[in-house]
């Protein structure tokens, strides 16, 4: 696989008889060369270093084609005219004036019944032509990703550029570059100066990521291991809840009653009692759990995923309103004498739409929780993590490299307040 010298995020398969495609992946990731900037438009250049007469190779329309893989989140965008729009991409020759190859859809797609995880759309060249350098320009992608905020999944999750069995003729004759395009400028022929953006691939192996340092959870472990009473942990599938759950497995002094949804307990322990409980369940379910197990302390770590826009279906909105606003409040009111410690993760994202449905619910929830906690003198901590481009509850013991320094600063303070 080739590697690009910029940020990680692109995967290229070597063009050869065995691996006959160029693979561009991680278009949905926030920590990649495309990532959060994909909605600004991206240029991908396939530079064929030697002119090749395709007609002399094989008279096959499938010799060279492009495959777009649409992510499952595409269905939330309602893209009625995405495929019909011919400006999804353009193919330019090196002189930037002549359209080299026109592409057409292999088949029509019915978006009204979009239930598959992925939908693959393939474009074939209509005619075989003698080609030299090909420039593939993804135009105005902000129309198709649904939002300009990082963290949302893009519609186009990957792009594959395929060659047929004769692709060995392309071996060692290709050079690939990429360039982010300013969305405020129209894409016109004389605007593109590709020579300044060439990137030479120097290695066939992907480099080892050196910035994989993990925060030492010694402080967290020491705090939790001092707990000498039965405790009920609500949450734990992600983030600090998961860390607490795993560390509790080492503490054999007390009984731990841990609610879970899909998470797995990494270490077996005779004092860990998993209780299947979903925060979408009614509060009565939790009543039975608490009555049966009599925990002396309750920790709340639940943290739902982030959505940035106002396009959520009504059913999802109701669920998120419940999990953010109603459930923590009910929990505090109901069990205020049970020595609850509330840990409420609430990300502050600098690119978040402050007028979105999610933001309003989160703000109301924080205000209501703070009011109840102060009224009953319940220890609580509303944590605003550093601005992340993913869900708000990234593990404190294994944060993303982009937020590592911020977590190192905030980590001791957060843990001391929780425990």
Report residues per predicted region.
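Rossmann-fold cofactor-recognition segment
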Residues: 269-284
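Conserved glycine-rich Rossmann-like NAD(P)H-binding loop of the short-chain dehydrogenase/reductase
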Residues: 252-266
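Rossmann-fold scaffold of SDR-type NAD(P)-dependent oxidoreductases
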Residues: 234, 295-305, 344
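Catalytic loop of short-chain dehydrogenase/reductase
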Residues: 304-309, 313-323, 339-374, 384-393
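Catalytic strand-loop segment that frames the active site of acyl-thioester-processing enzymes
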Residues: 1-37, 104-134
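N-terminal Rossmann NAD(P)H-binding glycine-rich loop of SDR-like oxidoreductase domains
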Residues: 234-247
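C-terminal helical subdomain
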Residues: 382-383, 394-419
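HotDog/MaoC-like acyl-thioester-processing domains
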Residues: 1-4, 58-121, 157, 161-235
